C-alpha cells in the first residue's frame, strides 16, 4: 500500500458550520518522486522508493549522489519505501501527489516521537507514586519491587523500568481527514500525530476502516 512522505507543520483548529471546534494537525504533502522500482526478480519483493523535498548536491555523500544521478531524479531530503503489488505500473521519475487521498476518509500516520530523555517509571509508564507521608521518607517515586525471590532469582525480560522515553517510531491509526488543500499541498487530520514540528511523517490510507 503506497502513501506519501510529508512534513508536520503544526496544530491548529477549524470550525464546522455548526460552530464545533475541531483540533487538527496540518501536514505538508509535496509531490513524492520515485527514485527506484523494486521487483521480485532483482530484489525478491515489490516496492517503490521515493524522495521528497530538495537537497543541495554538495550536501550529498557519494553513494547518495550516485543513486540520484542514476535515477535522474532531483535529490531529496531522504529516501523511503512503500510496498506494492506485483502488477504495479510505477516508473522511475514518476510523481505521486496528494490526489491519492481524494477518496480516502481515514489515514495511518507514522513518525518519530519527541524524545524526552531518561525518565523514571512514573513519567514513562504511569506508575502510581507511593505515599507522601505515613512513614515513607525516601521512596516516593521509586518503582518498588522488580522481582520475586530466590525463585526465579532474576528479573523478567520486558519489566517496565526507568529508561529513555520517546524518540521511537510511532504509528497513529485511523485519523480522520478533515480537509485537503490541493493548491497548497496540505492535509488536515483530526487530532495529534507523533513528532516535532518540521519532522517527517509517512501518511498511508488506514488499514482499519
UniProtKB/Swiss-Prot annotation:
<dbReference type="GO" id="GO:0022625">
    <property type="term" value="C:cytosolic large ribosomal subunit"/>
</dbReference>
<protein>
    <recommendedName>
        <fullName>Large ribosomal subunit protein uL3</fullName>
    </recommendedName>
</protein>
<dbReference type="InterPro" id="IPR000597">
    <property type="entry name" value="Ribosomal_uL3"/>
</dbReference>
<keyword id="KW-0488">Methylation</keyword>
<dbReference type="GO" id="GO:0006412">
    <property type="term" value="P:translation"/>
</dbReference>
<dbReference type="GO" id="GO:0019843">
    <property type="term" value="F:rRNA binding"/>
</dbReference>
<keyword id="KW-0699">rRNA-binding</keyword>
<keyword id="KW-0687">Ribonucleoprotein</keyword>
<comment type="similarity">
    <text>Belongs to the universal ribosomal protein uL3 family.</text>
</comment>
<dbReference type="InterPro" id="IPR019926">
    <property type="entry name" value="Ribosomal_uL3_CS"/>
</dbReference>
<dbReference type="Pfam" id="PF00297">
    <property type="entry name" value="Ribosomal_L3"/>
</dbReference>
<dbReference type="InterPro" id="IPR009000">
    <property type="entry name" value="Transl_B-barrel_sf"/>
</dbReference>
<keyword id="KW-0689">Ribosomal protein</keyword>
<feature type="modified residue" description="N5-methylglutamine">
    <location>
        <position position="150"/>
    </location>
</feature>
<dbReference type="InterPro" id="IPR019927">
    <property type="entry name" value="Ribosomal_uL3_bac/org-type"/>
</dbReference>
<comment type="function">
    <text>One of the primary rRNA binding proteins, it binds directly near the 3'-end of the 23S rRNA, where it nucleates assembly of the 50S subunit.</text>
</comment>
<dbReference type="GO" id="GO:0003735">
    <property type="term" value="F:structural constituent of ribosome"/>
</dbReference>
<comment type="subunit">
    <text>Part of the 50S ribosomal subunit. Forms a cluster with proteins L14 and L19.</text>
</comment>
<keyword id="KW-0694">RNA-binding</keyword>
